[in-house]
Curated annotation (Swiss-Prot):
UniProtKB keywords: Cytoplasm, NAD, Oxidoreductase, Pyridoxine biosynthesis
Organism from which the protein derives: Chromohalobacter salexigens (strain ATCC BAA-138 / DSM 3043 / CIP 106854 / NCIMB 13768 / 1H11)
Subcellular location(s) of the protein: Cytoplasm
Protein name: Erythronate-4-phosphate dehydrogenase
Self-association and partners: Homodimer.
Active site feature: R208, E237, H254 (proton donor)
Catalysed reaction equations from the record: 4-phospho-D-erythronate + NAD(+) = (R)-3-hydroxy-2-oxo-4-phosphooxybutanoate + NADH + H(+)
Binding site for substrate: S45, T66
Function in brief: Catalyzes the oxidation of erythronate-4-phosphate to 3-hydroxy-2-oxo-4-phosphonooxybutanoate.
């Protein structure tokens, strides 16, 4: 069997090596000529998978190591009889880590506490639901909006988008990109909704770039500059709007879900689906292959100030400022589009909060709840 894999997918050799010969290519270099003689294709979101790519090829199975599938023509795959799998939820915890690191940075810069804030989560799927679960331990009020789920499940606790935007001090977008239909999400935040945001609102988009009208957001910021904005996803990636880039508070190149833990989970999920497709046993397990984190434990004394302790643990695992500064260096050296892709391709090793164990000598000031809310493993010690 011949297997073509995006070069940035971790553990591909370990999981798929037993199946046959593996070829690795950059995601944007995977074209019709490259896939023609392949049996199995494993990609990320930067590779468009459709008839133009696969027509006339030997490909029998396509896996994308991502949650989203908007880069894949699912109708074509069904019609062509080509098996398919994505990796739902694989990097959800990584995205939540990104959001919490960003919120902590803004809270420190602006001098506010997350406790007592009203946070609106738009899109309550794998990412949004996990973000809500973690925030539950932080004494914040979570407002939830997910019209498809509200309709399917009869959820009366879900708000309409406009009701959420009217009340939320912090708005987090975690929706898929849906371009048509009753629940279309393209430009979900359009010019009218962006203009209606209260001054001082924090807007975080770590879902899909086109869910926010980037031009309208740029115009609001140019006109008033009265929002705090975190963008990890953008319209027209990688050729994003440089004027908008200059105006937002935290700008990163679609890396919120790029923890090595999330990537490895994605590889495992696609491997398992491929084994089912070809009627083979899935012998490899992620637990056998995952590397140990370089930082295993932090010990905090009873005198640790809660906010400083939370900040220390968060930044020990993941400091969003690292990505902000590194992306800025890349885009200044290479240009926006090339730098965007290059940083994603060369992204440094990052572990999730759950890989770090925090040992507390005393649960002072609700620190344990805050740390567990952020996703750390916490142990109380009497020693």
């Amino acid at each position: 069997m011949r297997i073509l894999v995006d070069e940035n997918i971790p553990l591909a050799d370990e999981f798929f090596g037993e199946l046959g010969d593996i070829t690795r290519l950059p995601g944007r270099d995977i074209d019709a000529a490259a896939v023609r003689e392949q049996d199995l294709l494993v990609v990320r979101s930067i590779t468009r998978v459709d008839a133009a790519l696969l027509e006339g090829s030997r490909v029998r199975f396509v896996g994308t190591c991502t949650i989203g599938t908007d880069h894949v023509d699912l109708d074509y795959l069904r019609e062509a009889g080509i098996g398919f799998a994505n990796a739902p939820g694989c990097n959800a915890d990584s995205v939540v880590d990104y959001v919490l690191s960003s919120l902590l940075l803004l809270a420190e810069e602006d001098g506010f506490h997350l406790a007592g804030k009203t946070i609106g989560i738009v899109g309550v799927g794998n990412v949004g639901s996990r973000l809500a679960e973690r925030l539950d331990d932080l004494d914040v009020e979570c407002l939830l909006c997910d019209p498809p789920r509200a309709e399917a499940e009869g959820r009366e606790d879900f708000l309409s988008l406009d009701a959420l935007l009217e009340r939320a001090e912090i708005v987090c977008l975690h929706t898929p990109l849906v371009t048509e239909g009753e629940h279309a999400t393209r430009h979900l935040l359009d010019a009218s909704r962006i203009d209606a945001l209260a001054p001082g609102t924090v807007l975080i988009n770590a879902g899909r770039g086109a869910c926010v009208d980037n031009q309208a957001l740029r115009e609001r910021l140019q006109r008033a500059n009265d929002l705090r904005v975190v963008l990890d996803v953008w319209e027209n990636e990688p050729g994003i709007d440089p004027a908008l880039y200059d105006l937002v508070d935290i700008a990163t190149p679609h890396i919120a879900g790029h923890s090595i833990d999330g990537k490895m989970r994605g590889t495992e999920l696609v491997y398992q689906a491929a084994m089912r497709q070809f009627g083979l046993p899935a012998r490899k397990k992620l637990g056998q292959l995952k590397p140990d984190p370089w930082l295993r434990k932090i010990v905090l004394t009873p005198w640790a100030p809660p906010l400083e302790a939370l900040s220390l643990c968060t930044r020990a695992c993941y400091d969003v400022r690292r990505d902000m500064l590194a992306f800025d260096r890349y885009r200044r050296r290479m240009g926006m589009a090339t730098g965007f892709d290059a940083y994603r391709a060369e992204y440094p090793l990052r572990r999730e909060f759950s890989t770090l164990r925090v040992e507390l000598k005393q649960n002072k000031g609700g620190l344990r709840d805050a740390l567990e809310g952020f996703g750390f493993k916490v142990k109380l010690s009497s020693k």
